[in-house]
Amino acid sequence: MNSLLSTTDLFIFFGSLFAVMAFGLWSGRKEENSEDYFLAGKSTRWWGVAGSIFGSNVSANHIVGMMGVGFAVGFAQSHFEITAIAGLLMLCYFFLPVYRKLNVYTLSDYLSKRYDDKSRVSYALIMVIIMVVIQMVPGFYIGSRSINLLLQGDTGKKAVAEASADINGVLSKVKINYGGDKYGSSPQIKIGSEIRENLSPILEDGKIVGVNFTENIIGLKPSMPMPVSFIGGNINNPEISPGDVEPFRYKLGILIMAIVTGAYVIFGGLKAVIVTDVIQSVLLLLAGLLVAYITFSQPEIGGWANLVARDLGSEGVERLHLYNASDHPSLPWTGVLTGLMVLHFYYWGTNQFIVQRALSARSDKEARIGILAAGFFKLLIPFFSIGTGIAAYYLFKDRNLEVAQDT
């Protein structure tokens, strides 16, 4: 398989990765005590606080995810960024003065001083679980998958189909919505959660064009179509599906990412983390703005004003509404003003890896300026990330482009 990256691309990618790690370790080389390790010696300037808060909250998968949600849902998703300002202001003027007055290193330390050690241990355990399950697992998954797909090249796309049953629950039809490509052997067919050995795919030039029935399949739900999955059949490795990453490569990617990130975090302390966060924030902002510029420069889009005008004329599929109806299935306006606000107060005011950046500031003033600057950068995301996803929605429609099946 040919890599999608050239030798120059590989040199830049891995060179910058290890350069950032090395620079972070070098920055944290003079740590002498706990305050240096946990709070960067309380010497961080406002721009370091801003860059580290932004970099800790926003990552490549965050930017890409917001583009995807903009494509699928629309501008209402921007409330995750806009209403974050309320949480940042709460941290800035209510929580932060208390934390800094008590001279705590971590929020666990604050709970220990305010209540007791049981509170400290309970909070620490909860935060470890949240960080691992909600943040690290998706980050490692997306990172390893992305790197492997770039390195191993085009391995094809999965087929997508749905099954229908008659009123008696007997399978009547399997509709192929997308035939995929690069199938070298017949994959197994799964309807719902069960593999069906008596179904076999019909292959033509590496694509699935139909399904053969060897006997009746019963016990299905007649009321709605059921998803059909195709397992295995890759032209290079029959054990995996087209577009998948080989399990060994996937695990190796996670291991490398864990070693690289763990090295500068564990050995460099908070100062190393802040330095690398600032670098990554600058790169993310520049890359996001560049992607937005390229997308909005396409003749089918023609800039923000033309996108707004086109969306106004797209009755029924508008993407630029800021508020959805109260019965919207995923993001009603009532949820924005209630549950989302509660989430922000927790995330920005009592979240260890956010608050610790502000605690490392050299003064209350520097901390506040840094927090407010991070909020400004957050307000850019709806336009260069979510807005780009909305523009991509209309661009894909005009060019009749296919959306990747795992998007």
Can you say where each PLM-predicted feature lies in the sequence?
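Membrane-interface "cap" regions at the ends of multi-pass membrane proteins
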Residues: M1-I63, G268, E366, G370
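Loop-to-helix junctions at membrane interfaces in multi-pass transport proteins
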Residues: N2-L5, K42-T44, G48, G65-H79, ...
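Membrane-water interface regions at transmembrane-helix termini and the short interhelical loops
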Residues: M1, V69-F71, F95-K101, D109, ...
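Membrane-embedded alpha-helical core segments of multi-pass
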Residues: A19, G87-F94, N103-V104, Y264-G268, ...
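Conserved, function-critical positions that sit in or immediately flank catalytic
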Residues: D154-D244
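Helix-loop-helix module between adjacent transmembrane segments
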Residues: S78-K157, N236-M257, T261-V265, G339-Y347
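Residue-level recognition of pore/gate-forming positions within transmembrane alpha-helices
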Residues: L17-V20, S56-N57, A84-L88, V128, ...
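Extracellular loop-to-transmembrane helix junctions
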Residues: L4-G28, T44, G48, G68-V104, ...
